[in-house]
UniProtKB/Swiss-Prot annotation:
<feature type="transmembrane region" description="Helical">
    <location>
        <begin position="278"/>
        <end position="298"/>
    </location>
</feature>
<keyword id="KW-0472">Membrane</keyword>
<feature type="transmembrane region" description="Helical">
    <location>
        <begin position="374"/>
        <end position="394"/>
    </location>
</feature>
<keyword id="KW-0812">Transmembrane</keyword>
<feature type="transmembrane region" description="Helical">
    <location>
        <begin position="60"/>
        <end position="80"/>
    </location>
</feature>
<keyword id="KW-0406">Ion transport</keyword>
<feature type="transmembrane region" description="Helical">
    <location>
        <begin position="525"/>
        <end position="545"/>
    </location>
</feature>
<feature type="transmembrane region" description="Helical">
    <location>
        <begin position="2"/>
        <end position="22"/>
    </location>
</feature>
<dbReference type="GO" id="GO:0005886">
    <property type="term" value="C:plasma membrane"/>
</dbReference>
<feature type="transmembrane region" description="Helical">
    <location>
        <begin position="130"/>
        <end position="150"/>
    </location>
</feature>
<feature type="transmembrane region" description="Helical">
    <location>
        <begin position="412"/>
        <end position="432"/>
    </location>
</feature>
<comment type="subunit">
    <text>The system is composed of three essential subunits: KdpA, KdpB and KdpC.</text>
</comment>
<dbReference type="InterPro" id="IPR004623">
    <property type="entry name" value="KdpA"/>
</dbReference>
<keyword id="KW-1133">Transmembrane helix</keyword>
<dbReference type="Pfam" id="PF03814">
    <property type="entry name" value="KdpA"/>
</dbReference>
<dbReference type="GO" id="GO:0030955">
    <property type="term" value="F:potassium ion binding"/>
</dbReference>
<feature type="transmembrane region" description="Helical">
    <location>
        <begin position="483"/>
        <end position="503"/>
    </location>
</feature>
Length: 555
């Protein structure tokens, strides 16, 4: 029965992807019906804020994005620092320590949601609502806006206006869908209140303080926007965030909704729907391989315990919630790292070595399917690399969407693809070379190395999940992961927007018999191979020293 539920869940991922992709294309490209519904409200916003609806250059678009995001980081930083004297603080929680406030503000603006604090004890209701939830809408709206400009550039059209796209992302996508999802979560038992903690009497007569809050509205945008941060420290393992299997499936659907839809949006906007389908199917195959790998490993249990003759019918159950079980915990771990959300319904630090390797590889690749917007930019980056390599092998000038891929584009892509591993491996080396980093490790040996690399991989990929055995709420970890999150977020977005702007200016080369097609199964295979060879092999030495070595040791 459990496998039937898994198949149905995956079918739901597939079935909602195309309709959502079509809706996104209409929402941003202009639809009379949508303009009639949302247009008056958006024009009012533009009038109040002084936004002029004109086409920007890629530099203007990127500058607008960075300045708006930077302003939001500063505002939210001071909310965290001053929450102790601000209203809506029934638990009288004090202001955040400076480096933790720095880390948290960047974390949520970068759509990472790395949490070096416990949600219910670290933030007031005001900080949760005005700080955290506000950024949970603004962060994915930023990248959804940018990916639309990116696709327009690839299609040879004007990039558009960042503030217009940002507003449309909020009014036409995130606010309506999150609102409806929040109502469903309330119906499923997720609390939504501004009241403080309630005191309950336990069976043995003791008193217990049960924390609550505006959780349903928080969880809906947490998953839809690929944010992932928890209202509670236990994240989606907490019964108030994720009461049962229905809420669990809904959360996974929300996580996958926009990332899986964007290939279809892309196909429609560039006038090649088949190419969008090829990208979707290719990535789903990689996703499926990851799920099969982690599930097989978790169901086989811990090799060390198996050798003792301990029964493991349910697989490795350490760190997992009984109400979800091993299979759905494995699926959730695959989804949350494939879609770069970072929400967890099981503790990733307790996964088996190969089970923990899958989430780690998903984040290292950062492209299966990746987070809202940012992930799709990486998908196209790998697609262009695949075309470039194929062109070199047959001695032809590489072409993508009928436009020649030349030195300028490849230099930008080369720098972009190297920057991600540089952040991860460089900062991991720094942490391992100083006691400021190694003192946080709770496990010696191979697993300790994986803890460190996982933290920086999660930060660079804007995922936010962690091997929570790492004692990371220290100035060193707060500052270094904050820098990695910021650089990992904005560097690739800007460089790839420059690539799209460069391609926009090029004339379309007529298609000939020798043109390498990017909308067939051959390209899909080369695309997958490029992801594996260029992406995964970059990190292979580290994976050998971490989870693979740990697995062989346990064996």
């Amino acid at each position: 029965m459990i496998w039937v539920a898994v198949v149905i869940t995956m079918l739901l991922f597939i079935l909602v992807a195309k309709p959502t992709g079509i809706y996104l294309e209409k929402a941003f490209q202009g639809s009379k019906k949508l303009d009639k519904v949302f247009g008056p409200f958006e024009k009012l916003i533009f009038k109040i804020t002084g936004v002029k609806e004109y086409n920007q250059t890629w530099k203007q678009y990127a500058l607008s994005l960075v300045l708006l995001n930077g302003f939001m980081i500063v505002v939210v930083y001071f909310i965290f620092r001053l929450q102790g004297v601000l209203p809506l603080n029934p638990a009288h929680i004090e202001g955040m320590e400076p480096t933790l406030a720095f880390n948290t503000a960047i974390s949520f603006m970068a759509d990472t949601n790395l949490q070096h604090y416990s949600g219910e004890n670290g933030l007031s209701y005001l900080s949760q609502l005005i700080g955290i939830t506000f950024l949970m809408f603004a962060a994915p709206a930023t990248t959804l806006a940018l990916v639309m400009a990116f696709i327009r550039g690839l299609a040879g059209k004007e990039l558009g206006n960042f503030f217009v796209d940002f507003t449309r992302a909020l009014t036409r996508v995130f606010l309506p869908i999150a609102f409806m999802a929040a109502l469903v979560f309330v119906a499923l038992g997720v609390p939504q209140t501004l009241d403080g903690a309630v005191t309950a009497q336990t069976i043995d007569g003791a008193k217990q303080s049960i924390l609550r809050g505006p959780v349903a509205s928080f969880v809906s945008i947490k998953e839809l926007g690929n944010n992932g941060g928890g209202f509670f420290g236990a994240n989606s393992t907490h019964p108030f965030e994720n009461p049962g299997q229905m809420s669990n499936i809904l959360q996974m659907m929300l996580m996958m909704l926009l990332p899986t839809a964007l290939p279809f949006t892309y196909g429609r906007m560039v006038g090649n729907k088949k190419q969008g389908r090829i990208l979707f199917v290719s990535l789903f195959m990689v996703f499926l391989l990851g799920f099969i790998t982690i599930t097989t490993s978790e169901l086989n249990g811990n090799p060390a315990l198996n050798g003792m003759g301990i029964e493991h019918v349910q697989g490795s159950t350490e760190g997992k919630e009984v109400r979800f079980g091993t299979v759905f915990s494995s699926l959730y771990a695959t989804v949350t790292t494939a879609a770069e959300t970072g929400a967890v319904n099981t503790m990733h630090d307790t996964l088996t070595p190969i089970g923990g390797l899958v989430p780690l590889v998903n984040m290292m690749l950062n492209t299966v399917y990746g987070g809202v917007g940012a992930g799709f930019v990486n998908i196209i980056m790998y697609a262009i690399i695949a075309v470039f390599i194929s062109g070199l092998m047959v001695g032809r000038t590489p072409e993508f969407l009928g436009k020649k891929i030349e030195g300028k584009e490849m230099k930008l892509i080369a720098v972009t693809i190297l920057f991600h591993p540089l952040l991860i491996l460089g900062f991991s080396a720094l942490a391992l070379s100083t006691s400021l980093g190694t003192d946080a490790i709770s496990h010696s040996g191979f697993h300790g190395l994986t803890q460190v690399v996982y933290e920086y991989t999660s930060s660079a990929a804007n995922n936010g999940s962690g091997f929570e055995g790492l004692a990371d709420n220290t100035p060193f970890w707060n500052i270094t992961t904050g820098l990695v999150m910021f650089l990992g977020r904005y560097f690739s977005l800007i460089t790839m927007l420059a690539v799209a702007a460069s391609l926009k200016e090029k004339t379309v080369v007529p298609e000939t018999v020798g043109t390498f097609r990017t909308d067939n199964s051959l390209f899909g295979g080369i695309f997958i191979g490029t992801i594996v060879i260029v992406g995964a092999l970059t990190f292979f030495p580290m994976l050998v020293l971490g989870p693979i070595a740990e697995f062989l040791t346990l064996k």
